[in-house]
A protein has these predicted regions:
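Regulatory N- and C-terminal appendages and interdomain linkers associated
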Residues: 1, 13-18, 117, 161, ...
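Conserved NTP-binding catalytic cores of kinases and kinase-like/nucleotidyltransferase enzymes
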Residues: 1-73, 197-202
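Active-site acidic catalytic loop and adjacent metal/ATP-binding pocket
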Residues: 3-12, 22, 169-215
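Glycine- and acidic
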Residues: 31-35, 87-92, 204-205, 221-229
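Active-site activation/catalytic loop segments of kinase-like enzymes and analogous catalytic loops
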Residues: 47, 209, 215-253, 270-280
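Short, glycine/acidic-rich hinge or "gate" loops at secondary-structure transitions
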Residues: 66-68, 116-130, 254-262
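Conserved short submotifs of the Hanks-type protein kinase catalytic core
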Residues: 74-84
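ATP-dependent phospho-/nucleotidyl transfer catalytic cores
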Residues: 85-186, 198
Length: 280
């Protein structure tokens, strides 16, 4: 299974080994491999398991092997099989209780690297949300998706007013998400990439879009991609405020946490997230 990657469950036998592991390899579809290679997705995930996994303050899978050829992007990750954990159905929408737990978890990660995220991008461990690859690629693919979407579906008037101008606005939206203070961003933090253990604690998976930028991006992405419109409208400000409070609780320097500026970043990122359903 998988879109940007092919995932396999491998059964193991023998002493001192788990009964199964998950093996992640490049996708079977050549177009998906091309896109994933261009966006350095395989390199990012391999680097996560090599450089960051032991520093993560949130639950993530155990990694057993991680290798990548940076010239060809051939890669392999062997990780813990979490198939026994509870999943949240993104099509149904995450419950508010699960959402609150997920917000607190990602706040712990953001707090650990708050104001220090740029170094990760400079070291090649992450890709900045302001990286030139995004404005080079996204306006074109958004334009293609928008043309197809508007020819086949009826859309709300508010979206129809924004869509024709969105590709032109994308570079500015992207640059606004790296004005700082920057931190480590999961990049794909949504219900499909969150499992819940026996204590109902979230376990984050899929680190192929690991990035550096404003942590508000992860929050906006999570809210817009994981909650129903009704739940999001009712709770988004509460979830945002919970995140800001949790940043300081988990160690982000209070002097670098500007609630008003972060709310603006959140709103900008939420607008940017229109790109995902259109491109998909």
């Amino acid at each position: 299974i998988g879109v940007s990657s092919a995932l396999y469950r491998c059964k193991l036998t023998g002493p001192k080994c788990p009964s199964s592991v998950i093996v992640k390899l490049p996708a079977l579809d050549e177009a998906a491999v091309f896109t994933s290679t261009m966006l350095r997705m395989y390199i990012r995930e391999a680097n996560f398991f090599k450089a960051l996994i032991n520093q993560m303050p949130i639950n993530v899978p155990v990694g057993f092997l991680s290798e990548v050829d940076e010239e060809t992007s051939r890669f392999v990750v062997v990780m813990e099989d979490l198939g026994n954990l509870r999943i949240a159905d993104q099509n149904v929408g995450m419950t508010i209780d699960d959402a609150r737990k997920s917000i607190d978890a990602v706040a712990r990660m953001h707090a650990k690297w708050w104001g220090e995220g740029d170094a990760l991008a400079e070291e090649g461990v992450t890709v900045s949300l302001g990286d030139p690859i995004y404005p080079a690629v996204l306006p074109f693919v958004f334009g293609e998706g928008w043309a197809k979407l508007t020819s086949e579906m009826s859309l709300p008037q508010a979206i129809l007013e924004i869509g024709p101008h969105f590709s032109e606005a994308l570079p500015k939206l992207l640059s606004s998400m790296v004005v700082g203070p920057n931190t480590l961003c999961h990049g794909d933090y949504r219900a499909d990439n969150l499992l819940f253990n026996e204590n109902n604690e979230p376990v984050a998976i899929d680190f192929q879009l690991l990035g550096t930028g404003t942590g508000a991006y992860d929050i906006a992405y999570f809210v817009t991609q994981s909650l129903t419109p009704e739940v999001a409208s009712k709770h988004e400000r509460d979830l945002f405020d919970q995140w800001v409070t949790a940043l300081i609780t988990h160690g982000a320097p209070a002097g670098l946490v500007d609630r008003d500026a972060l709310w603006l970043h959140y709103r900008t990122a939420a607008l940017f997230c229109l790109a995902y359903p259109v491109i998909a």
